[in-house]
C-alpha cells in the first residue's frame, strides 16, 4: 500500500527564525545552548528545508547525532516537520513529552489520555497509547485531535505493516495501541463509526497463515472474509487456525502445491487425517482431544464444500473428505460443580479484583446462561413485570431464541454492581445485527471477551483449589 501524501504539509520557515525559536526554548528550559545550537546549525546547513529531511532515506534520517535528534524533536513538536511514519515508528523519543509542553500537541495528547482513563485503561497502557499512537498520529497528520479521520488511522496502520515487513519485527505494541486508539477516538466522537474488528481480524488471519503457500493463503483469507457476515467472530477465528494448520501440513508434504484444485485424496488428505489423530497441543504437548480432531477435519471439509458450492475457480471437482473420516465423540451428561466446589469458587470470585469479569461469571452461574448469551446482554436487560418481580431478558443466542429468566433480589443487586463497574461510552455495533447496542459487559470502551472470562475462571478455580473449571459448568451448576 502506498501511503497518501499529506494534505497539510508544513510550510518552510526561515532557518534563522528556527534557530532563534530553538534558542529561546532552550533558555526557557534552563538547558545549555551552545552544543545544542551547534547541532541545530549543522542540521539546517544540511537541510535548510526540514521537508527535505523528511524525504530522505530512513537510514539517513536515523543516522543523525543525538543532539541533532533533539532539534528534530523540537521541530516535530512545533509543527515544522512531518518526518514520516517510518521514522516515527523506528525512532525512540526520550524527551517527547518534555519537548511538547505548552503546545497544542500536548493539550490534545492530554485530552486523549484523560478519555482513555475514563474508559478504564491502566496508566501504563494509557501512556503507551498516548505516545506510540495518538502523539504520532497528530504529529504526522498535523491535525488537531478533533480533526483526525478514519483515513489517518488507516494510513498509520499501513505504515506499521510496511515497517513489520521491512524489519521482520512483530511491532505488536503499535498494533495494539492503534486498536485501542480507535476505541478512544470513537468514544470521544472523533471517529463516527465504532471500531471494526474486520481489519484487525484480517491481519490476525494473515499472521496465523505463516508458513502456508501463498496461493493457498490467498484462498483461505478470501474464504474467511466471506464467512464474516454469517458466522460469529470466534467461529471465523477458529476456522482460520484450523486452515492454517492444514496449509502448513500441505507445505511440508508437497512444497510445490499452490492451489486447492491440485489436492489429491491419497497424496494429501489421507496423510493429513492420520497426522490429525497424532497431533499434540502446542503448549502442553498432550494429545489433542477427539473433539478438536473432529473440529480440524470439519473446518477443512466445510471450506472445500463451501467454495465448490459458491462456484469458486480452481477448486476440487470431487469430494475429498467424507463423513466416515470424522471421529466419534463421547456424549457424557453436562458436568456441574459439586456443592462444596461451587461454594469455594463463589467465595473466590466475590474477592477477585477484576470485578467486571468476576461478576459476569457470578451472573452466568445465577441465571444458567451460555457464555455467548451472557456477553450479549444489553444494559436494559432487566425488566420489571408488575406482580411478577424482575426478569432477565436473554438475547438471541446459540439456538437463535430469546427467553426470560426470573431474578431474585440478590441477582438484581449483582446486576446493579455490574452497571457500576462497566466502562462508559458510546454504543457499539452488534456483531450479528449491526445495530448500535449498549452492552452490559464493557471494559475500556470495548466488549468483554470470552477469552478474558475463561482466563478469570481458570485463575479463580486454581485459587479455590479446583483442578479445572470452564464457563459451561457454571450454566449447569
Residue map of PLM features:
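Short, charged phosphate-coordinating catalytic segments
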Residues: 305-314, 363-387
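Conserved tyrosine-mediated DNA breakage-rejoining catalytic core shared by Y-recombinases
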Residues: 271, 376-423
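Active-site/catalytic core of tyrosine-dependent DNA strand-transfer enzymes
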Residues: 408-466
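Extended, hydrophobic alpha-helical segments in both membrane/secreted and soluble proteins
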Residues: 370-374, 378, 403, 411, ...
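Short, basic (Lys/Arg/His-rich) helix/loop patches that form interaction surfaces
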Residues: 120, 124-125, 357, 367, ...
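Flexible interdomain linker/hinge and immediately adjacent N-terminus
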Residues: 193-212, 312-347, 391-402, 433-448
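Basic, Lys/Arg- and aromatic-enriched nucleic-acid-binding interface segment
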Residues: 290, 330, 339-375, 432-436, ...
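Charge-rich, intrinsically disordered N-terminal extensions
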Residues: 1-319, 328-331, 347-352, 362, ...
Amino acid at each position: 500500500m502506498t501511503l497518501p501524501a499529506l494534505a497539510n504539509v508544513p510550510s518552510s520557515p526561515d532557518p534563522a527564525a528556527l534557530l532563534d525559536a530553538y534558542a529561546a526554548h532552550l533558555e526557557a528550559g534552563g538547558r545549555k545552548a551552545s552544543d545544542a545550537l551547534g547541532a541545530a546549525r549543522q542540521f539546517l546547513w544540511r537541510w535548510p528545508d526540514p521537508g527535505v529531511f523528511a524525504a530522505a532515506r530512513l537510514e539517513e534520517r536515523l543516522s543523525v547525532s543525538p543532539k541533532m535528534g533533539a532539534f528534530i524533536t523540537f521541530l516535530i513538536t512545533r509543527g515544522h516537520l512531518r518526518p514520516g511514519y517510518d521514522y516515527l515508528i523506528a525512532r525512540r523519543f526520550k524527551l517527547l513529552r518534555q519537548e511538547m509542553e505548552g503546545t497544542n500537541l500536548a493539550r490534545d495528547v492530554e485530552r486523549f489520555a484523560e478519555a482513555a482513563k475514563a474508559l478504564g485503561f491502566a496508566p501504563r497502557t494509557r501512556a503507551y497509547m498516548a505516545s506510540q499512537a495518538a502523539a504520532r498520529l497528530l504529529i504526522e497528520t498535523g491535525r488537531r485531535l478533533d480533526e483526525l479521520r478514519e483515513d489517518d488511522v488507516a494510513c498509520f496502520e499501513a505504515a506499521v505493516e510496511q515497517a513489520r515487513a521491512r524489519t521482520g519485527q512483530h511491532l505488536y505494541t503499535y498494533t495494539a495501541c492503534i486498536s485501542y486508539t480507535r476505541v478512544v477516538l470513537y468514544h470521544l466522537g472523533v471517529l463516527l463509526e465504532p471500531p471494526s474488528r474486520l481489519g484487525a481480524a484480517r491481519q490476525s488471519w494473515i499472521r496465523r497463515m505463516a508458513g502456508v503457500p501463498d496461493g493457498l493463503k490467498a484462498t483461505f483469507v478470501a474464504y474467511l472474509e466471506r464467512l464474516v457476515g454469517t458466522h460469529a467472530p470466534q467461529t471465523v477465528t477458529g476456522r482460520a487456525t484450523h486452515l492454517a494448520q492444514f496449509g502448513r501440513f500441505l507445505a511440508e508434504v508437497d512444497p510445490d502445491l499452490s492451489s486447492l484444485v491440485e489436492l489429491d485424496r491419497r497424496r494429501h488428505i489421507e496423510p493429513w487425517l492420520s497426522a490429525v489423530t497424532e497431533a499434540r497441543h502446542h503448549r502442553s504437548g498432550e494429545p489433542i482431544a477427539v473433539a478438536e480432531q473432529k473440529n480440524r477435519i470439519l473446518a477443512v471439509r466445510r471450506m472445500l464444500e463451501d467454495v465448490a458450492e459458491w462456484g469458486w475457480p480452481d477448486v476440487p471437482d470431487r469430494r475429498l473428505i467424507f463423513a466416515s473420516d470424522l471421529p466419534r465423540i463421547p456424549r457424557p451428561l453436562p458436568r456441574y460443580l459439586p456443592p462444596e466446589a461451587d461454594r469455594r469458587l463463589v467465595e473466590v470470585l466475590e474477592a477477585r479484583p477484576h470485578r467486571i469479569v468476576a461478576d459476569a461469571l457470578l451472573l452466568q452461574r445465577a441465571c444458567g446462561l451460555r457464555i455467548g448469551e451472557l456477553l450479549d446482554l444489553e444494559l436494559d436487560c432487566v425488566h420489571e413485570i408488575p406482580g411478577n418481580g424482575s426478569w432477565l431478558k436473554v438475547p438471541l443466542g446459540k439456538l437463535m431464541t430469546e427467553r426470560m429468566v426470573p431474578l431474585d433480589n440478590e441477582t438484581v443487586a449483582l446486576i446493579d454492581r455490574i452497571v457500576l463497574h462497566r466502562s462508559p461510552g458510546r454504543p457499539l455495533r452488534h456483531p450479528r445485527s449491526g445495530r448500535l447496542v449498549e452492552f452490559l459487559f464493557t471494559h475500556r470502551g470495548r466488549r468483554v471477551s470470552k477469552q478474558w472470562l475463561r482466563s478469570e475462571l481458570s485463575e479463580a478455580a486454581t485459587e479455590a483449589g479446583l483442578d479445572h473449571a470452564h464457563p459451561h459448568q457454571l450454566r449447569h451448576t
